[in-house]
Amino acid sequence: ISVQHVNLFQTHIKPCTDCKYCHVHNGCPLHDSFENIAGKLDEADVIILSAPVYYLGFPAPVKAFIDRTQQFFVRRILFKREKMAHTKQGVLICTCGGSDLSAIEALKAPSEMFFSVFGAELSETVYLAGTDLTPEERRCNRMELIEKEMSK
């Protein structure tokens, strides 16, 4: 088993400008570390996307990377210029400072689309909310959730 870890916060991936280059050509006119990372995802059997939640969304470096996968969506899904096998597993791991579990719902659609352009299905989601809370606050939140479940 080989594992490769990429910290998108340590890359300088330019954001997609919606120039439509990928509608006519394979690839993107923006050249940065995106190509190398995307190539690794193409070769992977399992893709794990792990990120904190910022304002019900992915942080800027992750969002920029996901947006740049538009070229694969256009090539593989929209225009079907490239065949793709759906044989991979996608795993989403997120942390959220707040305790609102609705944040995970906001990330599911972009995550599913992201995984799909690499031939993966979102097979597992791991979500840890309340990371900004103290241990006592987390305990109280758990007790509130248990009480809500028991009152149903």
Language-model features: locations:
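N-terminal beta1-alpha1-beta2 submodule of the flavodoxin-like/Rossmannoid cofactor-binding fold
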Residues: 1-74, 126, 130-152
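Short, glycine-/small-residue-rich phosphate/pyrophosphate-handling segment
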Residues: 78-123
